[in-house]
Amino acid sequence: MTQTLADMRRDYTRDGLTEAQSPQEPFALFHTWFEEAVKTEQPPVEANAMTLATVDEEGRPHCRVLLLKGLDAQGFTFFTNYESAKGRQLAAHPFAAMTFFWPALERQVRIEGRVEKVSAQESDAYYQVRPLGSRLGAWASPQSRVIADRDELEGLIRQTEQRFADTQPHCPEHWGGYRLLPERIEFWQGRSSRLHDRLNYRLINAKWARERLAP
């Protein structure tokens, strides 16, 4: 018999998450979890894949999967076309949320905060280490705009290849990075019978406060 959606579930059986196991600030815990995800998750799961949520001018939410490309004491960095839908939304409402899910570890991390552009130098530094096809694509693709068909996109790629046939492409002004400056980070560890562990960190007056949330 075909399994119904109502019957689709799994019980989580890995270790829990206690306050004694957790540091007073969230970045150290995220680093630990991320390193474990890199070692544990297998393709097609990418440990640095996350869902980014933004809102448009009408307050309607939009979400999509991106790759985390930078992490430091300031926040979490990703790159995109500034003229894309997400870029326009962040220009109007510079706040976002991101979620990481690592199924092999039965873990999830939710992050919320203000978003700002990184410097042009930081954007260029990352752009230059991307594969050539990706660098050309940043010039060729009018991201999030309506196009006629795949042939139109292929034509734009050919034009861009011809444009940069004798030189390396440089980082376009309409493409670059954003850094999410976290104000809230929640760590979720799956537990049996849906009685999950949730440790929530909130930034209050430049200091992190830790609290446990009911599942």
UniProtKB/Swiss-Prot annotation:
Cofactor field: FMN
Its biological purpose: Catalyzes the oxidation of either pyridoxine 5'-phosphate (PNP) or pyridoxamine 5'-phosphate (PMP) into pyridoxal 5'-phosphate (PLP).
EC numbers: 1.4.3.5
Pathway: Cofactor metabolism; pyridoxal 5'-phosphate salvage; pyridoxal 5'-phosphate from pyridoxamine 5'-phosphate: step 1/1; Cofactor metabolism; pyridoxal 5'-phosphate salvage; pyridoxal 5'-phosphate from pyridoxine 5'-phosphate: step 1/1
Matches recorded under InterPro entries: Pyridox_Oxase, Pyridox_Oxase_CS, Pyridox_Oxase_N, Pyridoxamine_oxidase_dimer_C, Split_barrel_FMN-bd
Catalytic activity: pyridoxamine 5'-phosphate + O2 + H2O = pyridoxal 5'-phosphate + H2O2 + NH4(+); pyridoxine 5'-phosphate + O2 = pyridoxal 5'-phosphate + H2O2
Annotated residues for binding of substrate: R9, R10, D11, Y12, K69, Y126, R130, S134, R194, L195, H196
Family that this chain belongs to: Belongs to the pyridoxamine 5'-phosphate oxidase family.
Residues noted as binding FMN in the record, renumbered to the chain: R64, V65, L66, L67, L68, K69, F79, T80, K86, Q108, Q143, S144, W188, R198
Source species, domain of life: Bacteria
Recorded name of the encoding gene: pdxH
NCBIfam families: pdxH, PRK05679.1
Cofactor binding summary note: Binds 1 FMN per subunit.
Protein name (database record): Pyridoxine/pyridoxamine 5'-phosphate oxidase
GO BP annotation list: pyridoxine biosynthetic process
PROSITE patterns: PYRIDOX_OXIDASE
Subunit structure: Homodimer.
A GO MF label: FMN binding
Keywords assigned by UniProt, alphabetized: Flavoprotein, FMN, Oxidoreductase, Pyridoxine biosynthesis
